Curated annotation (Swiss-Prot):
It comes from the Bacteria. Residues 422-589 form the tr-type G domain. It is found in: Cytoplasm. GO terms for molecular function: GTP binding; GTPase activity; guanosine tetraphosphate binding; translation initiation factor activity. Residues 456-460 are annotated as: G2. This is Translation initiation factor IF-2. NCBIfam families: IF-2, small_GTP. The keyword GTP-binding applies. Residues 250-264 have a biased composition (Low complexity). Its main location: cytoplasm.
Amino acid sequence: MNVEQFAQELKLPPQLLLEQLKAAGVSKNDVVDPVTEADKAHLLDYLRKMHGGGGGETGKTKITITRKQTGEIRKTDSTGKSRTIQVEVRKSRTYVKRDPAALAAEALAAAEPAAAAPAAPPPALEEVPAEPAPIEAQAPVAETPAAEPAVVEAPAPEPAVTAEVTAPAPVEAAPEPAPAAKPEGEAAPVKKTTRIKKASILNEAEVKAREDEARRHQALLERQAADAKARIEREALRKQAEAAREAAKLAEAQKAAAPAPAAPTEKTLHKPDKPAAAKGAKGPDKKPAGAWKDDAARRRGGLKTRGGAAPDAGWRGRKGKSKSGQEETTFVAPTEPIVREVLVPETITVAELAHKMSVKAAEVIKALMKLGSMVTINQVLDQETAIIVVEEMGHIGKPAALDTPEAFLIETGEPGEAEMVARPPVVTVMGHVDHGKTSLLDTIRRTRVASGEAGGITQHIGAYHVETEKGVITFLDTPGHEAFTAMRARGAKATDIVVLVVAADDGVMPQTIEAIHHAKAAGVPLVVAVNKIDKPDANPERIRQELVAQGVTPEEWGGDTQFVEVSAKANTNINGLLDAILLQAEVLELQAPADGPAKGIVIEARLDKGKGPVATLLVQSGTLRRGDMVLAGQVYGRVRAMLDEAGKTVTEAGPSIPVEIQGLSDVPQAGEDMMVLPDERKAREIALFRQGKYRDVQLAKKQAAKLESMFDQMGQGEVQHLPIILKADMQGSYEGLAHALGKISTDEVKVNIIHSGVGAITESDVNLALASKAVLIGFNVRADASARKLAESSGVDIRYYNIIYEAVDEVKAALSGMLAPEKKESVIGTVEVRQVFVISKVGTIAGCYVTDGVVKRGAGVRLIRNNVVIHQGELDSLKRFKDDVKEVKANFECGLSLKNFNDIQEGDILEVFEVVEVARSL
């Protein structure tokens, strides 16, 4: 290793290192000179001597350690509010290590006069601190409070000599403490004699230095003893306070703890539970009655850090009561990480999560960044993400218990000992579109519902109850169109029996299979009605075979499904179908409590211009009466009016009876559970809580979707969007239409439904369409006068539809127009090159003959030589008889040149083509 490499290793300039080597007596003249281990040793010795590392009095090694500790205190102001204040404590300690060889020489020199003089123990007092290194190293141990009395009490000279030679042993072994004032007073004259006797060996400066060192060491040992004692008592107080906190937390979690008693004076809101017990543990001289006597002194006293204060300082330290200022602010850092159990609700902000873990919000944001999420301090996190973050930061995350207003519903939801009575069966009629479901119900009800539906197809759930000679049956008629999957699923959820209508001349179709799956998923028995058996091409046996393939086996083939052949048009075997339904209902033994608060399900909901929100309910248990307070999902309200399916006013509805109610605060979601609550305050509280919870969950999901689909969104610049605002008469209608429109989207064009709702088209809808350049679609609704006027003046397109097919077809046509056209090449002519002219300023001109088709200026051209395409470009100029022409037809000669290409030879063939754009369709 040379000087330059050594300097790089020491991170010093090479010239400075050369100067230091020369000063140390090592002859090095250049940075490339080699450096040996001996040279390094010489340099090290020189540097030690220069910086006080030599022997004698300069042989002392001093180490100064500065410690900075940060704690927190909670301070109560005059208003009773509690604040957290940061407290910083700084300590500086100097440790001195002396040369063991010098100490041994001094000890031997002092041994001779010590043996001769009877009053020699004081030198032991001077000599014991002479080796402070091992004592300092053991200072933090709690067993050393009695070190200083041991040295003072040694009466005989023999222990003194032993103490000097093996200094650490008597320091730790002395068991009995003794007051230090009297021995110090007696030892003073002896020290003077000792100095005279040792004058021949030690000079007076050394003796004085050792005396000062002994006094400093004595004071240090006293401080260490006091620190150790205070630390033990503080630890006991801390554990006691921690146990009290844990007990308080447990009591709060179980909601069983009584509220804390009020403090006798103000500004004591956060007192520990047992301050008197903590003071009583100190000693009998402390009076328990004085725990609150001098409260003003407590408020004026020292601050309490998180690690605790002096043991006799109570909850807040008093002036003059602690041993030293350092003891009050001593902070004991935790030796192991604190693992907290964090209860995470369904949604939580980053700031709240950081507060629960007692960390700064920046730490939580860093952890989320490491997980790939860029968040802010007010970002809402969903429960799953928050638990992952908690576990990532070393704590235990658990989903929070339901401490919500909805817990009231769980408590009140259990039915009591209400009497159970038989209830009518709820029958859902399902099947493929145009298989005759509604016509079959018409025949049963002897009405004409199907003819009133737009296009002859059902687009809503119709709920009716029919009183037959054999009993009451409630029917739910669901749409068969593929767009109404969600509506059919709701029908299956609320039903007891599913009647599957299959046309005998059509067979099993996709919606028939879907209805079977819905019934099986809901665990509902099936009754198959084979309709249209009066048609000539009806084949009931084929229907049975196709249904067996789908897992529906008729009873006559050994299965458990009843098959009934009916004709809605000819009114054939309708009573047989009703008998089959009632037989299945008897097997199910359907019962429900007739008394008590009603419960049910929202079948359909709409916004009526005159009546407001209107919901169709199916009561499942209890009795719904006019004036009841109803809660349905996020909406609530008092039942102002109740109508049956015929539009007649009724005052109450029992189990399995469908009714229309008015008086809700908003249009509820179809499929929501409905229940009656005792008071409006509780209903409003739960509804508002659900609204906020839904909003937070949607926001958290949207944020998660944004993060997950970041890469997917990068390529969406080329995708065309058709913005649509959708308004419908019923909630199920816009659900079905939105589903159907979403299915026709492709990778190039997408339908973007920016707003959908129930009710007429209003002025705000037109303004939204104007701002977002959207198309307004009204399904079975119309625009009001102000909206119509605004739409005409602003040019907003409003489309009205009554049949779902028409709406889907027109939107599909609009999307087809947004597709990028397909480009195709069409060859329009062929040209043969017969002569080539080279003109310096123009380039190569080809004299050609048009053999086929036509040549147009600006058309694309391919140059073919020996049946190989040499060049593809476009015509630059086209002339005939020195005149520029637009086109030259077959069997005529012309002159032409190609753009940016001159390699034309006689005999080449030019193929002329045009690019034609062809419209695409979905």
